[in-house]
């Protein structure tokens, strides 16, 4: 199954955080914070402005982004967890 986001939405795969600290301590899943970094895996075409013209997306597939920890809607596709969010929910692109 594949998912194509509509309008100004993007499909994001979270970047997994490390399982161990620098000192070698293993961090259990319950103690991990939700990562606020992810990779854009699909993108909509943009949104329609008040003048009726299409405003294209600034983000593209492959961009690594920073977003609010609790932003987006969680979805599971073929056993993989993703987030769907609006482009406006993205804080920045990591270059």
Curated annotation (Swiss-Prot):
GO CC annotations, alphabetized: cytoplasm
Alphabetical UniProt keywords: Chaperone, Cytoplasm
Primary subcellular site in the record, as a coarse category: cytoplasm
A single GO BP: chaperone cofactor-dependent protein refolding
Subunit structure: Heptamer of 7 subunits arranged in a ring. Interacts with the chaperonin GroEL.
Family: Belongs to the GroES chaperonin family.
Protein's recorded name: Co-chaperonin GroES
Species the sequence originates in: Desulforapulum autotrophicum (strain ATCC 43914 / DSM 3382 / VKM B-1955 / HRM2) (Desulfobacterium autotrophicum)
